Design a protein with these regions (language model features):
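Amphipathic alpha-helices of TPR/Sel1-like and other helical repeat/solenoid scaffolds
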Residues: 39-47
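Boundary at the C-terminal end of the N-terminal hydrophobic targeting segment
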Residues: 13-17
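Sec-dependent N-terminal signal peptides
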Residues: 3-12
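Low-complexity, intrinsically disordered Gly/Pro/Thr-rich segments
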Residues: 227-236
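Structural detector for internal amphipathic alpha-helices that build alpha-solenoid repeat scaffolds
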Residues: 18-35, 43, 52-69, 75, ...
């Protein structure tokens, strides 16, 4: 089942950026693409294709990607992202996101990481859909950009797939990573109710720069099985407020153990 984020992303992009084109020309082109008498991906490679033909080509590509999200078409579409016009690229990103086409992860991540790209936000949102666990560190690294922070937070809450939880734990535990990236992961973990990161929080809370965010998250995510790690954290921290908060949390969890 397609995720809500993918559908909302695709819908918002399509609503905002679909050009007004000649309906008859669009319908005729789409019919040709669907019959196979013309190839939509080839039409998208042509710089002189009309707006109606390009839009029909995008819609045909989107349908094919949804039907076959692991087909070679994914690579062809991904290769176009950096060379086609911005509006077409946005529509193609939405198509890749809707199809959860993981084969496009590298190209989408590259766009999301490009500071001067007008595609940064749509690429970051698409990355949450296509990248799975691989998207987590890339998205977290973008959190330091205030212009992207809110979108990145939403994407981190929604990203799904095998290994995502482990990627959150690894990112929170990485003492060499930027504090903004680790804090973004912590906030998203709370949004996901990801209780399995509590152990990593108990370690990270010993770092002064991480203390407050970890403290707030532990109050929401810690459970009785984390008591040993919480006691260790309480002994290690020197901030009186945090030490007191952990002490109260420990007593609360001991009472329900």
């Amino acid at each position: 089942m397609r995720s809500l984020l993918a559908l909302l992303f695709a819908a918002s992009v399509l609503a905002a950026d679909r050009p007004v084109v000649d309906h008859a020309a669009y319908t005729a082109a789409l019919k040709d693409f669907r019959k196979g008498s013309a190839k939509s991906i080839e039409a998208l490679k042509k710089t002189d294709a009309s707006a109606a033909v390009r839009l029909a080509a995008v819609d045909d590509v989107r349908e094919r990607l949804v039907d076959e999200p692991t087909s070679p078409l994914v690579g062809e579409v991904a290769a176009l992202l950096g060379s086609t016009d911005v509006e077409t690229a946005k529509l193609l990103l939405a198509a890749l996101a809707e199809a959860k086409a993981s084969g496009a992860t590298a190209q989408v991540a590259a766009l999301a990481s490009k500071a001067d790209s007008p595609l940064r936000i749509p690429a970051a949102l698409a990355l949450a859909e296509v990248g799975g666990a691989k998207a987590v560190p890339v998205l977290a690294s973008l959190a330091k950009d205030e212009a992207l922070a809110e979108n990145i937070q939403d994407a981190l809450v929604k990203v799904a797939g095998p290994g995502v939880t482990d990627a959150f734990v690894a990112g929170i535990s990485d003492a060499k990573a930027d504090v903004s990236a680790r804090n973004a992961l912590i906030k998203a973990a709370v949004g996901r109710n990801l209780r399995s990161v509590a152990g990593a929080l108990c370690v990270a809370i010993k770092e002064e720069s991480m203390r407050l965010e970890c403290q707030k998250a532990l109050l929401k995510l810690a459970q009785p099985s984390d008591l040993a790690a919480l006691r260790d954290a309480e002994k290690a921290v020197t901030n009186a407020t945090t030490k007191g908060a952990l002490g109260r949390l420990i007593k609360k969890l001991e009472a329900v153990k």
